[in-house]
Structures are given as C-alpha cells and as structure tokens.
Amino acid sequence: FEGDRIKAVREMIVSKTAAQRRVALEKILPMQRSDFEGIYEAMEGLPVTIRYLDPPLHEFLPTNSYDITQLAKDMHIGLDELKSVISSLHEFNPMMGHRGCRLAISYPEIAEMQTTAVIQAALAVNERHPDWKIEPEIMIPLVGDVAELRYVKKVVCEVADKLIQESEFDMKYHVGTMIEIP
C-alpha cells in the first residue's frame, strides 16, 4: 500500500468505533473496487479467487517515529495513545492471532466492504463484457472452526445477495475458505 491507500488502511486499524472504521472503509472501498475490476479485466472471464484481508494488523502500522507522529496528527489522536494502540496490536504468534476470519468476526464491516468491492467490481465488468459471465470466488482465510466460517459467510452472503438483487444482473458467486490450523 502506498500514499492514500496505506493512510486509509491505518485509519481503519486505529479506529476505536465501528463508525470511525466505516469512514475509513468508505475511503478504501473505491480503491479495492477499482483493483478488483482491473483483475477481472486482466483475467478476461477466467476464474478469480479474492482472498479477504488476512495479515496481522500490526504489519500495516508504521514503525518509525516520523510515520507514527504523522499518523497521530492525521488521526487527531495523541502520540502516546497511538503508540499504545500499535503496541497492543503487535502479536507474539500471528498464526493464532487476530487476523483472517477472526478479524472479520470482530469487525464485520471490513468483510462487508470487501464483499461490496468484489461484487460491485464483478457486476461492472459483467456489464461491459456480458459474455465473460464472471462468478466471483471469495476466500475467507485462516478458518479453524466451522462456526467461524458460518458467521463470516453469512455476512458475505447478506451483502452480496443484496447488491446482486439491486442490480440488473443475475450473477452467481462462491464463498470458500482456506482452512488453517496451526
């Protein structure tokens, strides 16, 4: 991520409330939608699997003093408060940590935004290229229990079904998982 992208992702990560997170996600949505449209266009109708946000959140946060100070200013929060957030997000064992499907369980608005981007991108490309008949394939990462998958799949399907119903197109999509048990 560069420039405005990393700034919006960092804003999403350090948000304290769902409302703050949704503001950041609204900035990320058009970026992801555009990226997914580009992928669908490049693949010219071939299957595409989109893996949802997976890395531990601390990997997106700044590590040097200048960037930490700048993020605190951009977010209008105290430097010590931001350092505390960064410290709290660092994970000793990231495979067992707060990432992948567990992130979508804690913050379903992230999965909602990613689903919106995936489905809107596929609908837009299908409109331009109806012969491609794109069927998005969504991968929920780092699933270790069926209950995790059920929860996140419900979030994904509710958003996808609503967007498809509101469109002029009948489009299929698939939701799968990467099962990872350390």
Task: Give the location of each predicted region.
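Conserved alpha/beta-domain cores
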Residues: 1-182
